[in-house]
Every structure is written in structure tokens, then in C-alpha cells.
Amino acid sequence: MTKAQLFGKPLADDVTRGVRAALKEWAGAEPGFQPHLVSVLASEDEASRVYVHSKARQAERLGVRFTARDLGADAKQDELHAVLQALSADADVHGVVLELPLAPGLDADAALRHIAPCKDVEGLTPANLALIAAGREAEALLPPTPRSVRFLLREVLGDDLRGRRVAVIGPGRTVGRPLTFMLNNRGVTVTLCNECTRDLRDVLAPQDAVVVAVGHAGLLRPEQVQPHHVVIDAGINVTPGGVVGDAVPDLPVRAQTPVPGGVGPLTSALMYQNLVRAVKLQRGERVE
């Protein structure tokens, strides 16, 4: 059995309090002002719809204006670019999210280039990722899911992650790739794995933690982990029985994030923290 369940809600609550404080301050100074977040869908991906519904619920609780633009799975690349460019140019829109993955045939890398970096609350535009890769995180909007993973690792391993060894399974655009740089920026030795990695048990054995973010239910199994491991499950898979992660539940490890309830709540809170930061960047205000 898992020795510790690592829940994201306590950390998410702390972040949300800061977001509420910023929104309250704006409401007092500018009655009627609401930051506006727009989520753009161009696929039939069920996991993306789960994320959108979660964002909408959180926006309603916070008092943030939220709009979902569903272009459908048959959207054309030029149409997607035009929508993202229009949202980026709209002064009434403060944050833009492109829900990934896109429908087959659509180029996510090309589409992300059409989101203004200062409205990129998911931190996935080339400009923000370049700052992260260069170790200039203070100037960027950081991707919320990798940032959630780093927060949760610190909860168990301590604030100083220097010298720790972490395996990241899944070199994806939204989690694995940016997380690799973000952990490296904190002095972590990162081993990047994928679904084709051979002898995964041996690769994982010396690691302090394992982060899995592939989108493959049951990918990480009991025979592949060690009792000293901290497992952060950033996978999301929609099954007939509900939403599950990439790791088998209740692994025999030191600590494990459940799905749902682990990475997800903190990711949502950090995205809205990014929205606050984005508003300040767009207004030319000082950003901490």
C-alpha cells in the first residue's frame, strides 16, 4: 500500500487565496473589472473537455470571466490561427489557452506561435519555453502542470531539490519537456523516459522520484517502482469508470499523488495565478 497520499488541494488553497486577494484588490480599484480567460478547443479529445469544464467551474468560483471557443475537430489550421491572433489582439481578453492535443492534421507548434506570450497562461508558447530553457523563469509565464509537479516534489523531498534524481516518463509538450528544464533549473538530475524505454525498472531504481505524464492508464506498475520512490502522476485518462492517471493506484512507494485530487487541483490554481500575472504584464505593472 502507498505510505502517503500526496494531495494537491492544500497547496492549491494557498495559491487560490493569493489569486482571490488580487481579484479583490482590482474589484475595489476598478468596480466591474473581471479578468477574461478564453479556452480554445479544436479536437474531440475527452480529456481536454474535462480540463475545460474544470477551468470553467474554478472561474465561476473565483469571479473570473470564462469563455470556451469550440472550433470542432474539423477546424482548419488557418481558422485556428485567425482565432488565436484575434484573441491575442483583443484588449478584453487577458488569457488564452489552446487545449491540447489538437485534432489530427492540426499543427500545435504552429498554432502556439499565434498566442501572445503575455496572454499564454499555459506557458507553452516558444517565447515562454525559451525563457524557461535559458533559466530565466522569473521573466516567463510558467506551465502550470510542470510547476505543480515541482511544488509537490518539494512537499516530500524538501524545498532544496539540488542533487535529487528524478525520472520523467513522457517527453510531451505540456508536461515532460518543460518540466525537464524546470527541474534542471533547480539542480535536479533528470532522466527523460518514454513509452519505448527498455528495462524501465532498472532505469527507475536509483531515482528519488518518478513523474509520469504519458496519457496511458496503468503505464507505471508495482513491479517497476521502489519503496523509496515519490510518484507524481500527471496523466489523465477518461475511462468508463471515471478519470484515472498513468500509474496504478496505491503503488508500494513512499508517496504518490492520486488521480483525481493530486496534480489537477494545484494545476488549476496555478493557471489562475498565471492569469493574474498576465493581467499585470499586459498593464505594464510590476510582477513578482
Curated annotation (Swiss-Prot):
Q: Kindly list the positions annotated as binding NADP(+).
A: G170, P171, G172, I236
Q: Which GO terms describe its biological process?
A: L-histidine biosynthetic process; methionine biosynthetic process; purine nucleotide biosynthetic process; tetrahydrofolate interconversion
Give me the reactions it catalyses. (6R)-5,10-methylene-5,6,7,8-tetrahydrofolate + NADP(+) = (6R)-5,10-methenyltetrahydrofolate + NADPH; (6R)-5,10-methenyltetrahydrofolate + H2O = (6R)-10-formyltetrahydrofolate + H(+)
Q: Which GO terms describe its cellular component?
A: cytosol
Disulphide bridges, residue numbers: none
Q: Name one GO molecular function term.
A: methylenetetrahydrofolate dehydrogenase (NADP+) activity
For this protein, what is the EC number? Answer: 1.5.1.5, 3.5.4.9
Q: Which UniProt keywords apply?
A: Amino-acid biosynthesis, Histidine biosynthesis, Hydrolase, Methionine biosynthesis, Multifunctional enzyme, NADP, One-carbon metabolism, Oxidoreductase, Purine biosynthesis
Tell me the InterPro entries matching this sequence: Aminoacid_DH-like_N_sf, NAD(P)-bd_dom_sf, THF_DH/CycHdrlase, THF_DH/CycHdrlase_cat_dom, THF_DH/CycHdrlase_NAD-bd_dom
Q: Which pathway does the record list?
A: One-carbon metabolism; tetrahydrofolate interconversion
What does the sequence similarity comment in the record state about its family? Belongs to the tetrahydrofolate dehydrogenase/cyclohydrolase family.
**HAMAP family cross-referenced by the UniProt entry:** THF_DHG_CYH
Quaternary assembly: Homodimer.
What function is annotated for this protein? Answer: Catalyzes the oxidation of 5,10-methylenetetrahydrofolate to 5,10-methenyltetrahydrofolate and then the hydrolysis of 5,10-methenyltetrahydrofolate to 10-formyltetrahydrofolate.
Name by which UniProt lists this protein: Bifunctional protein FolD 1
Source organism of the structure:
Deinococcus geothermalis (strain DSM 11300 / CIP 105573 / AG-3a)
The organism's lineage is:
Bacteria, Thermotogati, Deinococcota, Deinococci, Deinococcales
